């Protein structure tokens, strides 16, 4: 996704992300309504990747992919190409690092269920990514952006905003403000 933003023209990215977002929403809604063909296919293909709240639900709750595509669309519209690509890179890599480190190495848990190790992995990877992709940006701005992105991930349940949506928006805003 970040590569698409960097390589394709902005308007093409906007149309592509809009098409994918609407298609994803329609397919997920069909799965929620248990529509025979689309719903069954969706459940067979993605059941193992969905979180518990996305599988067992009394109301339509979009999966993380909807939030990722919505964030990609908004970042592409609102931020520079470089900021949008960097923001999505932070979300894709750092959120994965946090989940993996938290799951396999997490020993100290906070009250929100997040682990110290996962949170540290998010911050370190976000700082590393931003140090490379925003190498001209002042170190203090990179640290602040990584810290705010980590906060968006850490406080996901309290903010009631999916971190796949909040991380790229916070990161992209800060990068546009400080650097791009």
What residue ranges belong to the model's regions?
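Interhelical loop and helix-boundary elements at the membrane-water interface
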Residues: 1-19, 26-132, 143-180
């Amino acid at each position: 996704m970040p590569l698409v933003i960097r390589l394709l023209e902005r308007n093409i990215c906007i149309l592509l992300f809009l098409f994918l977002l609407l298609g994803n929403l329609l397919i997920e809604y069909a799965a929620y309504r248990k529509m025979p063909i689309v719903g069954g296919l969706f459940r067979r293909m993605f059941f193992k990747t969905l979180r518990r709240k996305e599988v067992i639900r009394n109301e339509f709750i979009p999966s993380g992919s909807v939030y990722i595509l919505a964030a990609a669309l908004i970042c592409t519209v609102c931020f520079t190409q470089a900021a949008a690509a960097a923001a999505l890179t932070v979300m894709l890599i750092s959120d994965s690092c946090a989940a993996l480190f938290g799951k396999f190495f997490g020993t100290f848990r906070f009250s929100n269920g997040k682990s110290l190790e996962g949170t540290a992995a998010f911050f370190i990877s976000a700082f590393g990514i931003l140090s490379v992709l925003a190498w001209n940006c002042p170190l203090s701005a990179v640290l602040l952006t990584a810290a705010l992105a980590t906060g968006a991930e850490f406080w996901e349940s309290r903010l009631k905003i999916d971190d796949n949506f909040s991380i790229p928006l916070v990161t992209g805003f800060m990068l546009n403000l400080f650097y791009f």
